[in-house]
């Protein structure tokens, strides 16, 4: 019976306001994402270098559910995750994807947001930046004769 009581120990989290996580990237860039097509995923890690567990208050997108970016954290997709336990000397993986809505611009444009990590009352950010581009999409199109295309936007065939 004594062994059982000694084997149980309450989880203790590092609660210092000086504690920080180590992130793999300060900025994730997406280059030339055609509107409505979506991007590939960009990965990042959040690491706990301490000998104690960390309790992340939240990991979320700054733009919330209106963000063009999507957050996948340890296999779960969403805009915000709360009360995440990060074991000592452990890390978690995150992936970001962006899907940019069309607009009236014929030139490339940029959309931005950030991943906000809250720990012990402090925040850290990973900046997100994607260059969007409107385009003409030719899906299942058949060209049977000579055509002249305008050069105001790229064509995605």
Task: Please state what every model-predicted region is.
Residues 58-60, 98, 121, 132, ...:
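A mature extracytoplasmic/lumenal domain signature
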């Amino acid at each position: 019976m004594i062994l059982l009581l000694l084997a149980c120990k309450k989880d203790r989290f590092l609660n210092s306001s000086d504690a920080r996580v180590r992130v793999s990237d300060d900025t994730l860039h997406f280059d030339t994402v055609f509107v409505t097509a979506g991007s590939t995923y960009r990965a990042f890690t959040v690491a706990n270098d301490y000998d104690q567990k960390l309790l992340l208050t939240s990991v979320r997108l700054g733009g919330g559910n209106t963000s063009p970016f999507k957050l996948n954290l340890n296999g779960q997709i969403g805009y915000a995750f709360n009360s995440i336990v990060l074991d000592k000397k452990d890390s978690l993986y995150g992936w970001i994807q962006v899907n940019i809505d069309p607009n009236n611009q014929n030139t490339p444009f940029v959309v931005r947001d950030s991943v906000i990590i809250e720990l012990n009352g402090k925040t850290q950010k990973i900046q997100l930046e994607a260059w969007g581009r409107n385009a003409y999409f030719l899906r299942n199109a058949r060209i049977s004769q000579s055509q002249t295309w305008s050069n105001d936007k790229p064509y995605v065939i």
